[in-house]
Amino acid sequence: MRESIHKYLQVGLISFMAYPANMRGADENILDVLKKVACDDYFDAIEVNWIKNPALREQAAKLLRTSHLKVCYGAQPRLLTTGLNACDVNEEGRKAAEDTLMEAIDEAEQLGADGIAFLAGKWAEETKELAYEQLLKTTRNLCAYAKAKAMNVELEVFDYDIAKKSLIGPAPLAAKFAADMRTTCDNFGLMIDLSHIPMTYESPEFVVRTLRPYITHFHVGNTVCQDASAEGYGDEHQRFGFPGGSNDTKEVLEYLRVLKSEGFFNAEKPYVFSFEVKPWQDEDPDVVVANAKRTLNRAWALLED
């Protein structure tokens, strides 16, 4: 494409994946991470997560207000690091997950985000239908609370049998859930991630076309999921070019082609398109981020006008 990617997409970084020290919300150096991203004008958006220290959180909010970045809030770590499950068939467990996600909405508002993203929890075949109803209950309650603040709620589509083993996807089930949600909640949407698509045995074209009416947010990254004995197998979001990875420049280009053909390049109101990349073992986070930019730059250069 001759035109800049920034005309059509808000390129973002999931800060707590690229710099995972804050995954549990307790990184004392979180302001340094946020400043690093805010000072890099490659990025139009930043995705943040919980910051448990109230004083640090207020300083972060001030920094983000100054940055002119689109701020997004990922509530997934609140569930993944605590074992809470938004579709828990035990009502007490479901309510505990809902409570932390309600707190996430408040925190997102303070940080300047216009909503939160979360994921469905683990499931069992014998209680799958009940878990689905529990997830509807949680999500409807979140949407009602967010609606009063003019905020949105997004559910990220994950794998169902490899790593996170989440109730939602694959794509057809995600579409059913989103349709059920949209009957009562117009502030609900779906987030898709290129790194999860190989893990649900689907293609970008199939996923985007199946979920098209409901998609509000995009992630892009890599995964190792073809060989269970391979280093880094599972939902680890390795850098592009990682041995055994499913996604690289070719797959990012295919993803962009599908988004373009399906009308997701919107110059008036661009969608967030964020890198979800994570250092593997002792890799340097800054180099991993540079790798992601380089990969996207090449894919964009190859994309036909």
Predicted regions and their residues:
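N-terminal pre-domain/capping segments
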Residues: 1-103, 109, 185-187, 290-305
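Active-site acidic/histidine proton-transfer and metal-coordination neighborhood
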Residues: 2-3, 87-189
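Hydrophobic faces of well-ordered beta-strands that scaffold small-molecule active sites
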Residues: 7-16, 44-48, 69-76, 116-118, ...
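Acidic-and-aromatic substrate-binding clefts and catalytic sites of carbohydrate-active enzymes
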Residues: 20-26, 45-60, 124-126, 133, ...
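Alpha-helical scaffolding segments of alpha/beta enzyme cores, especially the outer helices
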Residues: 32, 36, 55-66, 99-106, ...
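Acidic/histidine-rich catalytic cores of soluble enzymes
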Residues: 146-242
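A short, acidic, amphipathic alpha-helical segment used as a generic capping/interface helix at domain edges
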Residues: 202, 244-266
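Active-site clefts of carbohydrate-active enzymes
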Residues: 233-240, 268-286
